[in-house]
């Protein structure tokens, strides 16, 4: 018997079956860096339309986690896909380097020494700490295969960035939008600083819930009542009732607010008179333990205005005032009002001339003037206030409640509302709120669409933007304060001159902290209010959200890689209240336009059960763990596979599925590359019109799937890319087309039309696969590209620079429907053969002959194709459906067809393994006529 294996055109490629990603990926990263792959990708589109994805800066603190890894991979997919689509998309990564978390870490390392060190030294240590983690995270992001300008990222602590941030503040000052005043803001007693809305997280918290009575010995109460009722009221035993979950604010009470239109019940209980909302009376009575009560009258809240109650602890007045925000959802309908500790309280205080009283230090400790509670922090004061109220007889009831309460994003401790002198950007100044809302509706595409309503509601209801922080590590608020009268000097011309110095200074805005007041104050400057000349520098720094929110000015407008406005901002959905929000206000406030055209958000990464990752639960999966076990490619594939616009799950099981999918895609690439050996497109390519029918159809099929994938990239539907690519490789290629043409590729003459026709489709398929894979499976696409025969590559030195000119088949819908029907027929034939294989009657489908009893439509569809090749059998006979034998299989899912499967007749060809008549060629007695003809040339 002759060895005919050598006469077959078997696949030949050095592209390995085993990926060995953990070893190969670092080698490829090194090669990318040495050969400048990122630059080559961008240069390929040097003259093309620019696409700007502006990177939201991650915080330079700690290692990357799954959320930041997913974010960076998503951005990388977009940048690479846009470049491969012919746009010039450059990626400038950035880092947020200022702020409390870094300062906290430095303080922890310094311990008690921090009090002895000047601000300049603390800032130097913060700068070094941030720089260290920029380097750590940069290596971790690069390990994910993310391409970008890693050597020149933007850092919010660079002098040019700090200057740009300060300049934007100057622009707001120039427009008159910056206000300095005393207002209640979120305050963290542990961090000793104001907090922005975006720095507050709401968590479940248990608080004391107390009902308190305020003595109301005022004749005005009697005037509000009918005469017959007034005569029964003993003012010395009359009270207005309030409810609060913050007992510590009772010492700072300045008023009691009622709704002008609500009805209030004047209720007698054991000789005492209580005033509270009529609708809430039954619930309150139960809480107070009243077994019986008598409503003497009801009175509109408006009639109680001006009555003066007495503070429940101190000898101080608490007037009754009107407020529309009072509700009947809970409490008593009478609201304890402390203008120093609540936004609505503050507004009510302004309207009614109440003192904004908040006698505590930055740690939330009551000052000496606060009788009974001096020296206690607010949380220590809670039980003491309750004790005092009980002692003086004004505590009606107390209990514990669990509710959603604001906590500091950094230290995770509960925060308070506290009125302090702060700097604000006024939301009504220059119509900032109105302009921002219009921009949200008219000028930005929000993906998912619900993002629009979310940010619209936030901007619509937000207070003025508190931009000051009482810390060291950040950009200073450039202003001088008169020591004699507290007047502010922030003339824009002077502000911009200081900004210019920041830009020149080696350490940027350290200039402000290093220079003495004499070096900074303009010569001869006198206070315009009092004429004094004693000035001090403003100590506060800018909110880090203002820092990062002005990145459009520092980066998008300034760097050659970008242009304003950016095409896309992409971050987690929490950034509707964070970076998207601050960037919008900063841009609209100075330029009247938003900084972005499209805003795309992703969800959080959770575990397999949908739980948030937490060290305490022990369910944290770090990116490095996945890379060490599977390689970055598998993590990248996972990012593409999930619907990232929602919260996404990750687990070992999910990653195992990714590994299986990856293996199938890799094997498909390897098979195609192996069968392209010896193929030169310039001399061997077959025009679509000259191809074999199935090749023509396959080319059309792959083209259509390629278009689906490219459209999905354009629409940010990466899970659609993943599923289409997976289906193409496993079903439409491996299980269908590649399976069918294997015989022809191996057995036909090396240069025959049959083989070259199939190879042309494989060449085109590989080009499309590379373009479709590269944004996601970047390492594998580059590896596969490096193993392509040189004559197929063109001038591109990297897969990210390929711009393939694809052959376009011309197939009409009728022909497509014909092939879809044929694919269905083939599926049913495969099913019919399977029982024989399972029962070991046959070893391979080539051991069979099939008879198809077909209706007219199916019979016609089967005309003009090489049927034995199509069904991978040794014989095919077509007969009318009416002649179907009893032993024929009748498919349930395809009408008009019956299939009879039997063992093939003839002898098995030693070369192609088909059963046929052998020995027609005396030189090759073991071969079928087809194989003998191939060898005869």
From Swiss-Prot:
PROSITE patterns: AA_TRNA_LIGASE_I. The keyword Transport does not apply. L-isoleucyl-5'-AMP binds at residue 571. ATP binds at residue 615. Keywords: Aminoacyl-tRNA synthetase, ATP-binding, Cytoplasm, Ligase, Metal-binding, Nucleotide-binding, Protein biosynthesis, Zinc. Its cofactor is Zn(2+). IleRS has two distinct active sites: one for aminoacylation and one for editing. The misactivated valine is translocated from the active site to the editing site, which sterically excludes the correctly activated isoleucine. The single editing site contains two valyl binding pockets, one specific for each substrate (Val-AMP or Val-tRNA(Ile)). Monomer. This is Isoleucine--tRNA ligase. It comes from Maridesulfovibrio salexigens (strain ATCC 14822 / DSM 2638 / NCIMB 8403 / VKM B-1763). The gene is ileS.
């Amino acid at each position: 018997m002759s060895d005919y294996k050598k006469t077959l055109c078997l696949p030949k490629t050095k592209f390995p079956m085993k990926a060995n990603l953990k070893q190969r990926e670092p080698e490829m990263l090194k090669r990318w860096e040495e050969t400048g792959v990122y630059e080559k990708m961008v240069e390929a589109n040097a003259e093309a339309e620019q696409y700007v994805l502006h990177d939201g800066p991650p915080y330079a603190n700690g290692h990357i986690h799954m959320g930041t890894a997913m974010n960076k991979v998503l951005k990388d997919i977009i940048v690479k896909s846009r470049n491969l689509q012919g746009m010039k998309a450059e990626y400038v990564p950035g880092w947020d380097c200022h702020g409390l978390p870094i300062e906290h870490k430095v303080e922890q390392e310094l311990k008690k020494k921090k009090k002895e060190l000047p601000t300049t030294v603390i800032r130097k240590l913060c700068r070094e700490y941030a720089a260290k983690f920029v380097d750590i995270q940069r290596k971790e992001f690069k390990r994910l295969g993310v391409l970008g300008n890693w050597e020149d990222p933007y850092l919010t602590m660079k002098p040019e960035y700090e200057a740009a941030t300060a300049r934007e503040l100057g622009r707001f000052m120039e427009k008159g939008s910056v206000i300095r005043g005393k207002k209640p803001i979120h305050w963290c007693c542990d961090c000793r600083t104001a907090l922005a809305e975006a720095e507050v997280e709401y968590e479940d918290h248990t608080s004391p819930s107390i009902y308190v009575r305020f003595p109301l010995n005022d004749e005005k109460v009697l005037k509000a009542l009918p005469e017959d009722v007034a005569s029964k009221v003993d003012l010395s035993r009359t009270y207005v009732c309030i409810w609060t979950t913050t007992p510590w604010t009772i010492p700072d009470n300045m008023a009691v607010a009622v709704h002008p239109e609500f009805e209030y019940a004047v209720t007698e209980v054991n000789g005492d008179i209580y005033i509270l909302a009529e609708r809430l009376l039954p619930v309150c009575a139960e809480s107070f333990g009243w077994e019986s009560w008598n409503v003497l009258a009801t009175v509109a809240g408006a009639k109680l205005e001006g009555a003066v109650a007495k503070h429940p602890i101190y000898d101080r007045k608490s007037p009754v005032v009107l407020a529309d925000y009072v509700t009947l959802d809970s409490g008593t309908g009478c609201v304890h009002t402390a203008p120093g500790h609540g936004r609505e309280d503050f507004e009510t205080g302004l309207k009614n001339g109440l003192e904004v009283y908040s006698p505590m230090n930055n740690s939330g400790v009551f000052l000496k003037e606060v009788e009974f509670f001096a020296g206690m922090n607010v949380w220590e004061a809670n039980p003491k206030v309750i004790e005092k109220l009980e002692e003086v007889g004004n505590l009606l009831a107390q209990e514990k409640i669990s509710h959603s309460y604001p906590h500091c994003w950094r230290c995770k401790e509960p925060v308070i509302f506290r009125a302090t002198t702060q700097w604000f950007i006024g939301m009504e100044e220059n119509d900032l709120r109105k302009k921002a809302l219009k921009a949200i509706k008219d000028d930005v595409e929000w993906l998912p669409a619900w993002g629009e309503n979310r940010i619209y509601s936030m901007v619509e209801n937000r207070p003025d933007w508190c931009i000051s922080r009482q810390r060291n590590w950040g950009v200073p608020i450039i202003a001088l304060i008169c020591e004699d009268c507290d007047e502010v000097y922030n003339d824009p011309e002077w502000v911009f001159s200081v900004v210019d110095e920041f830009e020149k200074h080696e350490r940027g805005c350290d200039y402000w902290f290093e220079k003495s007041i004499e070096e900074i104050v303009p010569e001869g400057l006198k206070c315009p209010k009092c004429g004094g000349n004693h000035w001090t520098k403003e100590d506060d720094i800018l909110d880090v959200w203002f820092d990062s929110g002005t990145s459009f000015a520092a980066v998008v407008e300034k760097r050659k890689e970008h242009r304003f406005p950016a095409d896309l901002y992409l971050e987690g959905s929490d950034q509707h209240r964070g970076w998207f929000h601050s960037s919008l206000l900063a841009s609209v406030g100075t330029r009247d336009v938003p900084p972005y055209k499209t805003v795309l958000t992703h969800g959080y990464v959770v575990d397999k059960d949908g739980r948030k990752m937490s060290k305490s639960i022990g369910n944290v999966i770090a990116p490095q763990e996945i890379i060490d076990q599977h390689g970055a490619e598998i993590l990248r594939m996972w990012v593409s596979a999930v619907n990232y616009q929602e919260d996404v799950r990750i687990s070992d099981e999910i990653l195992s599925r990714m590994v299986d999918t990856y293996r199938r895609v890799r094997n498909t690439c390897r098979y195609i590359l192996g069968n392209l050996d010896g193929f030169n497109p310039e001399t061997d390519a077959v025009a679509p019109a000259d191809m074999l029918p199935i090749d023509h159809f396959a080319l059309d099929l792959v083209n259509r799937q390629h278009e689906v994938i490219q459209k999905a990239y354009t629409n940010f539907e990466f899970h659609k890319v993943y599923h289409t690519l997976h289906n193409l490789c496993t079903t439409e290629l491996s299980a269908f087309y590649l399976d069918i043409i294997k015989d022809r590729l191996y057995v036909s003459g090396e240069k025959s039309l049959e083989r070259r026709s199939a190879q042309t489709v494989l060449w085109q398929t590989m080009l499309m696969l590379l373009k479709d894979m590269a944004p996601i499976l970047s390492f594998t696409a580059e590896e596969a590209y490096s193993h392509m025969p040189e004559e197929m590559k063109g001038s591109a030195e990297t897969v990210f620079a390929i711009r393939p000119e694809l052959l376009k088949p011309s197939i009409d819908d009728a022909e497509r429907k014909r092939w879809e029907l044929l694919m269905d027929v083939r599926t049913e034939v495969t099913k019919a053969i399977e029982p024989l294989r399972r029962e070991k009657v046959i070893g391979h489908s080539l051991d069979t002959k099939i008879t198809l009893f077909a209706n007219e439509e199916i019979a016609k569809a089967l005309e003009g194709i090489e049927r034995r090749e199509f069904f991978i059998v040794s014989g095919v006979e077509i007969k009318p459906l009416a002649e179907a034998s009893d032993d024929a299989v009748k498919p349930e899912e395809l009408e008009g067809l019956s299939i009879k499967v039997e063992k093939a007749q003839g002898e098995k060809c030693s070369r192609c393994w088909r059963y046929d008549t052998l020995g027609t060629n005396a030189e090759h007695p073991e071969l079928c006529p087809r194989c003998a003809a191939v060898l005869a040339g």
